[in-house]
Amino acid sequence: MSEILPYSDEKMGHYGSDGDVGQISFSCRLQDTSSFFGGNQQKRPPKLGQIGRAKRVVIEDDRIDEVLKGVSDKSPSGV
């Protein structure tokens, strides 16, 4: 995982006049980005027939028939 490394005082951005006590860090750097950029290059894109197809879902609920029946019995309220 990447770590954010703090900058030293020389690389801090100063704002305001010299008498003001204000500093703001304007940059950060990442360490070990090889896993971020090279992680998924071995995975192939899906074939055209696979795009948009849902995986099979198994619903294990004893009262699913009652729930589905109740939804279809309800009539939409007047709009």
Curated annotation (Swiss-Prot):
The gene is camk2n2. GO terms for molecular function: protein kinase inhibitor activity. Potent and specific cellular inhibitor of CaM-kinase II (CAMK2). Traps Ca(2+)/calmodulin on CAMK2. It is found in: Nucleus; Cytoplasm, Cytosol. GO terms for cellular component: cytosol; nucleus. It comes from Xenopus tropicalis. Residues 43-69 are annotated as: Inhibitory domain. Disulfide bonds: none annotated. Belongs to the CAMK2N family. Its main location: nucleus. This is Calcium/calmodulin-dependent protein kinase II inhibitor 2. InterPro entries: Camk2n. The keyword DNA-binding does not apply. Pfam families: CaM-KIIN. Keywords: Cytoplasm, Nucleus, Protein kinase inhibitor.
